[in-house]
Amino acid sequence: TISLNKLNMTQYEQFLTPENFKLAFVRLKTSSRNLYKTIYYEDLRIFGLYLDENIESTINQVKNEIYKPEKSHKIFIPKKDNLVRPLSILTFIDLLIYQAMTNVIADNSYDVIAPYYDNLIFGNIVNPSTANVLDREFFFKSWKRKWKRFNEVSKENFENGYKYLSEFDIASFFDTIDHNILCEILANTFKIEANILELLSKCLETWTADSNHKTFKSKHGIPQGPISSPFLADLYLFYVDTEIKKLNKKYDFKYSR
């Protein structure tokens, strides 16, 4: 059982608990098996052999400001449109710390974004801190259930007289997410504390860099591959959701993503 008593704890203190890092480890382990997970699967197994000791060591590195994120390695996956999708391969420690940070961000942002779940937002829905123990081991709720719900809502819209469907895709979305804007949204809308955001910003800037290009750094882009990234991308889009919801009062249309 992994539980986290948040009473009288700052978000940074929540982040640095062994319980949170164990939860991060379990969530990496329970994530869907895909190419990205295959790459770090052996690291998961080895780290788990001495899990408590390795987590304690990792937390101490962060507490004592010894921890430094490392530049990612990039691999490129062909897409159907003849373009490529870049995957950012992080070290396992970086990946674990990223997930541990995102656990805290997810728990502390949930009450703000939850009213949009199953209403406007149907993908990448996180399990809240109030979920049962087994569900909490998974970062996201079952995508199959959410896909079913999305199709049900779409069908209802057509049955209610809406005739036209427009689909949009943001080109190179992950690569163009501005770190400063992301941190402003996390701070102002979701009340994430400054020291969490400082570490997140430092990590994202480093991971955006490519190990093959020693001097290149960027203030935009989040790593594709880790399960933390689509959740942060959803929080980044939250402003769009709220603005479109305002337009919905003036124009008769339905919006979902």
Language-model segment annotations:
Residues I2-K80:
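Non-catalytic, polymerase-adjacent accessory regions of viral genome-replication enzymes
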Residues D107-E167, S172-D178:
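Active-site-proximal segment of RNA-dependent polymerases
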